[in-house]
A protein has these predicted regions:
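A broadly conserved detector of short glycine/acidic/proline-rich loop/turn motifs that flank catalytic sites
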Residues: 8, 15, 167-168, 269-272, ...
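Nucleotide/pyrophosphate-binding catalytic subdomain
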Residues: 1-249, 356-369, 390-393
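N-terminal cationic-hydrophobic initiation segments that often serve targeting/anchoring roles
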Residues: 24-28, 259, 347
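Short glycine-/small-residue-rich flexible loop motifs, especially phosphate/cofactor-binding loops
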Residues: 77, 122, 189, 255, ...
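A conserved regulatory-domain signal marking ACT and ACT-like small-molecule sensing domains
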Residues: 279-394
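A conserved active-site cap/scaffold subdomain adjacent to cofactor or substrate pockets
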Residues: 235-300
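Short aromatic/hydrophobic-glycine micro-motifs
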Residues: 85, 127, 247, 263, ...
Length: 394
């Protein structure tokens, strides 16, 4: 059996529901499905969770709380109409809307997106809905792994295939507790581990794990789509290193939960089911790759705190803006063989002076007047080097 998790964009609207239903219909081994709250799409520009945050903080932010609740209601009614299903959750939403946000526990309020969308999707698929608060248990503010795994196994034996919401559970008093933002990935990993799944399939809106952050994929979409391909395979260790820099599309805690279990993670695109995605496994030989990170400050922090204490080649190139480093390029090679080549290419093709700090693997552009050119030249260099790395994989 497999566990599948579908993110916010996969749940955004009626078209997305139908697309995911097709994927699940073609994948009978996916026995447990965790879903996120509705995300953005061409039709909807706001995430459901963000609307709930607006409701909670509306008055202080100058936003109408009623407007936020009305928008959530509109989207749920649209699901009802277009999917021809009957939702019994609108009354629950209206009860929330009639209360003052301070009367509602924050975790409870923020978890309602996953709760509503999991119930709606279970109704659409005619599969049992399992409230995550029944199977994901916290104690003393942290996850109670042993009890949680017991409850998940018992529930699976009882109902078989089911739908549940990601991101939340409950504590020993029955109060709703949430994971960090993006915690739906964590829920999926917990389910996969508890059920000793064949694999954990994490569906998102990109073709797999790219060697740079999803934000950069969208920002440089035209160039990256034509040149840089997602990684076909990557080890858990390398994936965790990418997680340090907010590069992958899977939460780092989800990766840590499954590391050492023998359960691989498969990152796939909901919107292109013919793409193979990225296979994250324990003992695979990680391909050579380089990757770009959003912030060099994050690189410095990780290298200093000792988490990345490996005999690896580390190199970063960044614009020094005076306060923060932006558009950093960070290259990671398992065997270090490309380091000299990268340095040579950069010094030859980029008309800047560089300062090398070998203890942190940092190379900083010193000519601040060329900041915009630095951004473009560094990213172009990243594209060039990524293409070379991928050629070596093929």
């Amino acid at each position: 059996m497999k566990v599948a998790k579908f993110g916010g964009t996969s749940m955004a609207d009626a078209n997305s529901f139908q697309r995911v239903a097709t994927l699940i219909g073609e994948n009978p081994d996916a026995r447990v499905i965790a879903v996120s709250a509705g995300g953005t799409s061409e039709e909807y520009k706001e995430k459901i969770t963000d609307l709930l945050i607006d409701f909670k903080n509306g008055e202080s932010l100058g936003i109408s709380r009623l407007k936020a609740i009305n928008e959530i209601e509109r989207r749920l009614i649209e699901l009802e109409s277009r999917l021809k299903i009957r939702l019994n959750i609108l009354d629950e939403l209206l009860k929330i809307g009639r209360k003052l946000p301070n009367d509602l526990p924050s975790d409870f309020l923020l978890s309602r997106g996953e709760y509503f969308y999991a119930k709606a999707f279970s109704e659409f698929l005619s599969l049992p809905f399992v409230d995550s608060k029944e199977i994901i248990k916290f104690k003393g503010g942290v996850l109670n792994y042993g009890f949680t795994e017991f409850l998940i196994r018992e529930k699976y034996r009882e109902v078989g295939r089911f739908i549940t919401g990601g991101f939340y559970g409950s504590d020993e008093n029955g109060e709703i507790k949430t994971f960090p933002r993006g915690g739906g990935d964590i829920t999926g990993a917990i389910l996969a581990k508890a059920l000793n799944a064949e694999s954990y399939e994490n569906y998102t809106d990109v073709d797999g794990v790219y060697p740079f952050s999803p934000k950069m994929i969208k920002r440089y979409a035209e160039r990256t789509a034509k040149i840089v391909k997602p990684l076909q395979k990557i080890s858990f260790d390398a994936m965790l290193r990418l997680c340090d820099f907010s590069v992958p599309v899977v939460h780092s805690s989800a990766v840590e939960i499954l590391k050492g279990t023998g359960i691989p993670i498969v990152v796939k695109n909901t919107f292109d089911r013919f793409k193979s995605g990225t296979f994250v496994s324990e003992n695979c030989e990680t391909e050579d790759f380089c990757f770009a990170a959003e912030s060099c400050e994050k690189i410095k922090t990780v290298l200093k705190n000792g988490r990345w204490n490996r005999t690896r080649a580390e190199l970063s190139i960044a614009e020094n803006s005076g306060k923060t480093f932006e558009n950093a390029l960070f290259a990671y090679m398992p065997n270090g063989e490309l380091t000299e080549e990268i340095l040579r290419e950069i010094s030859r093709d980029t008309p800047l002076d560089f300062k090398t700090e070998t203890d942190e693997g940092e190379v900083v552009a010193t000519d601040k007047s060329r900041a915009e050119n630095v951004k473009k030249e560094i990213f172009d260099m990243f594209i060039l080097l990524s293409r070379r790395c991928h050629k070596r994989m093929l």
